[in-house]
Regions:
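N-terminal periplasmic/intermembrane-space "pro-region" immediately following the signal or transit peptide
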Residues: 15-75, 84-86, 90
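Membrane-embedded beta-strand positions of outer-membrane beta-barrel proteins
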Residues: 49-53, 99, 140, 187, ...
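Transmembrane beta-strands of outer-membrane beta-barrel pores
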Residues: 55-63, 91, 101-107, 142-146, ...
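Residues that define the transmembrane beta-barrel architecture of outer-membrane proteins
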Residues: 75-81, 119-124, 179-183, 190, ...
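Outer membrane beta-barrel
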Residues: 86-205, 236-237, 436
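Detector for outer-membrane/organellar transmembrane beta-barrel domains
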Residues: 92-94, 240, 250, 261-403
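Repeated loop/turn-to-beta-strand initiation elements of outer-membrane beta-barrel proteins
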Residues: 93-97, 135-138, 193-198, 205, ...
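Outer-membrane beta-barrel "beta-signal"
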Residues: 382-386, 431, 445-459
Length: 459
């Protein structure tokens, strides 16, 4: 129960992913699948290996909150040392084997040095890709199937739930790269001006309780493959316009999706992403999942009133990017998550009785569930971002972003400065804060501010 609720703060613990993962601007417009892959024939090019060592030290400050947060509280100190590796091997020209993995050694307050949580492993991807015909691919294994054109929220990214890798950055585009893949079988074909693909992800385990304390080398297939799911999509380019249509299939949660990207002039790119389907509201889904996994009592009622019946819900992200003289890029997006908490829901959440521990547990569980699903807890928000890859000097990169709730104006903000010491070394500092009144979405979090110092060594 406690671990499940602490997941609400996974999005508020800052640890920067590798700098090569943080450059998300190339996602607009999005490249076609495998379009960047060039079959190699020389023996020395059959193996591609990317390895880096990372040390990230985090300090955080907490505040008193109106709704009691069940223990354990978010940590104030953590040091994480990681070995991150991505290996691609082509035994023959038509076959590629891919392994993406991260091993962590964690030192953290209130955590015994040799406990089960000290050593962790995140198996992000492990799959084989076969090219039986030119530009036709069949992939099998654990694959990170990412979808969407927006940066702050991707309604068509249907395989994001339960994939969060511990201690990841707050940056949503980094989260989408640095996450667990799903075991699946995927086929896709590419042609000039478009592509088509279909995939099937089988149910391997029953749904499991949400965990914030990741143990040992658990691959966590129970969170990525807890339901039978399928996805079919087609992409096409018409002049400067890129579009994609998707059909997602899952029992009681099937959806259709569409996204489009188009440049406007020389420096602006506009994009929109939508998904819709019949589903329960976030509160009902969270309480139902807690009951199903045994985290909440079977007869636990929703802590605040909510619609129990399934209805058609829309998810939308619409916005654009503006690049100034190839030096600074600004992004502005509007997000609609129709199943999320409305202004009235947040008022009921913050006004709920505080003297009933079981009720407080359920209130925080709803937010922990939203974080685990990598979906907004609130119904409407704005996303703003600015990135300068060469700020003041060539080796300094600055970027920052904010999520602003349209229900109460509270804000989640992160600012990052990365300095490339050499081709092999990078140093970075990142700070994040939850800003708002004590009864607001962000201001109600116990963790008010956190910072991280990171040093990365590339091999």
């Amino acid at each position: 129960m406690r671990a499940a609720i602490v997941c609400a703060f996974l999005m508020a613990r800052t640890a920067i992913a590798a700098p090569e993962d943080s450059d998300d601007l190339d996602r607009i417009p999005r490249d076609l699948p495998h379009a960047q892959t060039i079959p190699t024939t020389s023996r020395q090019d059959r193996v591609h290996l990317k390895i880096y060592f990372e040390n990230a030290a985090t300090l955080a400050a907490r505040r008193d909150v109106d709704i009691p947060f069940p223990p354990p509280l978010p940590y104030d100190f953590q040091n994480r040392t990681s070995l991150d590796s991505v290996i691609e091997w082509r035994p023959v020209r038509q076959v590629k084997l891919v392994l993406s993995d991260r091993a962590d050694l964690v030192e953290q307050e209130s955590l015994a040095l040799m406990s089960k949580q000290t050593v962790r492993n995140e198996l992000r991807e492990a799959y084989v890709s076969w090219e039986p015909f030119a530009r036709t691919y069949v992939d099998a294994g654990r694959i990170n199937a990412r979808e969407g054109t927006a940066l702050g929220f991707n309604p068509t990214d249907f395989f994001r739930p339960g994939t969060l890798v511990g201690q990841a950055s707050l940056d949503p585009s980094v989260l989408s790269r640095n996450r667990l893949g799903t075991v699946m079988l995927r086929a896709q074909a590419i042609w000039d001006g478009g592509s088509v693909s279909a995939l099937y992800a089988p149910r391997l385990f029953a749904p499991s309780a949400i965990k914030s304390a990741l143990l040992g080398i658990d691959p966590r297939f129970a969170v990525t493959n807890a339901a039978d799911r399928g996805l079919a999509k087609i992409t096409w380019n018409l002049g400067d316009t890129s579009a994609e249509a998707l059909l997602y299939l899952e029992t009681h949660r099937s959806k259709v999706g569409f996204d489009v990207t188009r440049p406007v002039g020389q420096s602006v790119i506009a994009y929109a992403e939508w998904a819709g389907g019949y589903d329960e509201a976030l509160i009902a889904r969270a309480i139902g999942y807690g009951r199903e996994t045994g985290t909440l009592p079977r007869d636990a009622p929703p802590p605040i009133p909510t619609q129990r019946a399934r209805s058609f819900h829309n998810d939308l992200a619409v916005g654009g990017s503006w690049t100034i003289a190839a030096a600074v890029t600004f992004n502005l997006e509007y997000h609609l998550h129709q199943g999320g908490l409305s202004r009235n829901d947040w008022e009921r959440w913050s006004g709920a009785r505080r003297d009933i521990p079981a009720l407080a547990n359920e209130l925080w569980y709803i937010r922990g569930y939203a974080s685990d699903q990598l979906e907004p807890a609130t119904r409407q928000q704005l996303f703003l971002r600015a990135a300068a890859p060469k700020a003041f000097v060539d080796r300094l990169e600055l970027d920052g972003f904010s999520f602003v709730s349209l229900a109460d104006g509270s804000t989640l903000t992160q600012i990052t400065a990365s300095y490339y010491l050499s081709d092999a070394w990078t140093a970075a500092f990142s700070a994040s804060a939850n800003l708002g009144s004590s009864r607001s979405e962000r201001g109600s979090f116990p963790q008010v501010i956190s910072g991280i110092v990171q040093l990365v060594r590339y091999q």
